[in-house]
UniProtKB/Swiss-Prot annotation:
GO MF annotations, alphabetized: ATP binding; ATP hydrolysis activity; DNA replication origin binding; lipid binding
Coiled coil: none
Keywords linked to the UniProt accession: ATP-binding, Cytoplasm, DNA replication, DNA-binding, Lipid-binding, Nucleotide-binding
Role of this protein: Plays an essential role in the initiation and regulation of chromosomal replication. ATP-DnaA binds to the origin of replication (oriC) to initiate formation of the DNA replication initiation complex once per cell cycle. Binds the DnaA box (a 9 base pair repeat at the origin) and separates the double-stranded (ds)DNA. Forms a right-handed helical filament on oriC DNA; dsDNA binds to the exterior of the filament while single-stranded (ss)DNA is stabiized in the filament's interior.
Protein known as: Chromosomal replication initiator protein DnaA
Provenance organism: Flavobacterium psychrophilum (strain ATCC 49511 / DSM 21280 / CIP 103535 / JIP02/86)
């Protein structure tokens, strides 16, 4: 068939019938039915898609399929060009079109995120300052006290700290982009995130660094939608060289904010800017965060900060005493370190409170005083039950050997015991599902999730099983 007789429509129809045979119907309906063919010139087919995100999705997931389909129709020099036609861009009532090359030809630099036509370059609004000031002075929001100097290294944070250092030395230039630091409360995620920012500012004063919590980011975004300046919001964030977002799990369930963050993230990543995220969960345990965002969180490095071990706890205490110029007997430091294990924040709180008590009451710090202070702290902290302890309690309750509980056996009573251990590990510890699985017989996170669901279901339908749960719960709550 000569190209002469071909129309954009006929070429695209043929492509579609090929594509339809090669993907699931639902995917076809979602991603291919909305596309319109626009024009055909030589060996280039223009297709119209409804949004920039739509284009990114096609390029990310279906570019090979599109290429094969088009090559069949137009030969090996086939080109696919996109026209993005947004019927209604945010705050801009006229539709507008922009053209983008497809990834499999040498792309001209694509335009930045959809700028409405009539808004060529008005004042850019910085969500942090009064609008109307032309020269954007962006306050980094960093806390200079949170530096690498006072972020002590130990086994519990070595990976995260070294990755943080590498990023601070070469922001955007390592494979740790994004760098996601995750772990329980009070272990130093925020401190490390600030430390990276502080270090970058020291080494590269010309770089724009911004620290912001996901909660404030969300509030700013909602505000920008209300005021009809979502684009300004996006452009502001595109100016940042090192963006640090704290507690990114706060975005869960907030689809609008996730969508805008997705665009900002893509832009920053493609332009070699650095993104640093902190979270109290590993990506695999985050609920209600879109898949496309989660997959991007995994592009770089996810580094977990664990609870500090005994040696690290001692160093942390000594460091605080040294900074405050206070001497304290070794046995007292050891006593505090042995008894406060859950997190760094409580450890610091206890020692600071101890120093305050002694200077305030003009008393020597004695072991007795240390016991009183530590008791106050430990009382207020729900005792962290370890996964090992949970497995031991469950095994004893069912009179099983620990090895049997962790084995691969599928005997019903063992499977139930194993599922209960997983269920209580999720309830009583801050460990990630993957971590729980690996400690209970080397299972994956999906197994743990399934176990928790099974236990939830059985508790409501099986009296005997509910008794198991209540009994073990009592033993663990002692």
């Amino acid at each position: 068939m000569h190209t002469m007789n071909k129309t954009a429509e006929s070429v695209w129809d043929n492509c579609l019938s090929f594509i339809k045979d090669n993907i699931q119907e639902q995917a076809y309906k979602t991603w291919f039915e909305p596309i319109k063919s626009v024009e055909l010139t030589d060996n280039a087919l223009y297709i119209q898609v409804p949004s920039k995100f739509f284009y990114e999705w096609l390029e990310e997931h279906y570019v090979k399929l599109l290429k094969v389909a088009l090559t069949k129709e137009l030969g090996k020099n086939a080109k696919l060009l996109y026209k993005i036609k947004m019927e209604n861009t945010y705050g801009n009532k006229l539709p507008f079109t922009e053209q983008l090359p497809s990834a499999h030809r040498s792309p001209v630099r694509t335009q930045e995120i959809d700028v409405p036509v009539q808004q060529k370059n008005p004042e850019l609004r910085n969500p942090f300052i009064i609008p109307g000031i032309r020269n954007l002075k962006i306050e980094s929001q960093l806390n200079a006290n949170y530096s690498f100097d006072n972020f002590l290294e130990g086994d519990s944070n070595r990976l995260a700290r070294s990755a943080g250092m590498a990023v601070a030395n070469k922001p955007g230039g390592t494979s740790f982009n994004p760098l996601l630091i995750f772990g329980g409360v009070g272990l130093g995620k925020t401190h490390l995130a600030h430390a990276i920012g502080v270090e970058v500012k020291e080494k590269y004063p010309e770089k724009t660094v911004l620290y912001i919590s996901a909660e404030i980011f969300t509030q700013q975004y909602i505000e920008s939608v209300k005021k009809n300046n979502r684009n300004d919001f996006i452009h502001f964030y595109q100016l940042i060289d090192v963006l640090i977002i704290d507690d990114v799990q706060f975005l869960s369930g907030k689809t609008g904010t996730q969508d805008v963050f997705f665009h900002i993230f893509n832009y920053l990543h493609q332009n070699g800017k650095q993104v640093i995220l902190t979270s109290d969960k590993a990506p695999v345990d985050m609920q209600d965060i879109e898949q496309r965002l989660l997959s991007r969180f995994k592009w770089g490095l996810s580094a977990e900060i664990h609870q500090p071990d005994y040696e690290t706890r001692i160093s942390i205490l000594k460091n605080i005493l040294y900074r405050d110029g206070v001497e304290m007997p070794e046995e007292i430091i050891e006593y505090v370190a042995r008894n406060i294990k859950s997190n760094v924040r409580e450890l610091e709180g206890a020692i600071i409170s101890l120093i305050a008590q002694s200077s305030f009451n003009k008393k020597e710090v004695t072991l007795e005083l240390a016991k009183q202070v530590v008791e106050k702290f430990v009382k207020n902290v729900k005792r962290e039950v370890s996964i090992d302890y949970i497995q031991k309690v469950v095994s004893d309750y069912f009179q099983l050997d620990l090895e049997v509980l962790q084995s691969k056996t599928r005997k019903r009573h063992v499977v139930q015991a194993r599922q209960l251990a997983m269920f209580f590990a999720k309830r009583y510890t801050k460990a990630s599902l993957a971590n729980i699985g690996s400690q209970i017989g080397d299972r994956d996170h999906a197994t743990v999730l399934h176990a928790c669901k099974t236990v939830d279901n059985l508790v409501t339908t099986d009296k005997q099983f509910k008794k198991f749960v209540d009994d073990i719960n009592k033993k663990l709550s002692l």
